[in-house]
Amino acid sequence: AMASVAAFSERAISGEFGEAMQGKFLANQNYGIVPIISALAWGLGYFGMPHILIRFMGIRSNKEVALSRRIATVWVVIAFIGTLIVGSLGTVYLPEILSPSAAETVFSATIQKMFPAFIGGIFLCAILAAAMSTADSQLLVASSAFSQDIFKGLIKKDATTKEVLSISRIAVFIIAAVAFVLSLDENSSIFGLVSYAWAGFGATFGPLVLLALFWKGATAKGAIAGLIGGGVTVVAWHNIPATVAPIFGVYEILPAFIVCLVLAVVVSLLDKNKDPEMIAEFEAFKKMED
């Protein structure tokens, strides 16, 4: 491991990596406005991550929100810097894996090349742990939403705790099975699936979260309209090729986010049945901030 790290350091100090990276970036200067907008639009997805938001909802005290926010932001910055470093250096250190399908294994390939099996296994376990942490959080959020909000909230309001638990377990099984089937598609990549899911989360939930936090005029009907409109736009935009029109090359999260936001606002303004209890709760939280 030390020999690999030493060799890696020598190549970095010699300027080899810098020259190689410069050559790769200069060879890809044909980026237009569409790829740039699409890259920036990825940030919209953070507003609609239910498995992250639920952590803040379950916080012990509202006094800890500010600290938690800072910790989360710092951690994301550190993680993304590490990701960029590994990906950038991997394109030079491991040029043989630059095919679109193999490029997703750059982290594991770099570890296998630089560290012995024992240490490499520990690092690879960290990747698996991160994936499992995200997966189980999303499964729990999805199953609880279906069992509590849909089954008990709409289908059977007098459902017992045992019935809700059974529905929750069934939902976990079905969602996991669907995810497994999607993973069997040999023509799809991890990045492609994550990108699609990221757009779905961000465009359907993101605008609603922002409206719920900053606008007391938002209503349930507006939220439902925005949710449906954003979701349909994501699916439709994703399946329309850019050859139809250049604008369809824009990452689907951006148009879907706008559609969801506009529909939620318009329908809420048209909805005369405002919930006085929700407005009072909004005002109470606003006074707490002041």
Predicted segments — roles?
Residues 1-290:
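Membrane-embedded helix-loop-helix hairpins and adjacent transmembrane boundary segments
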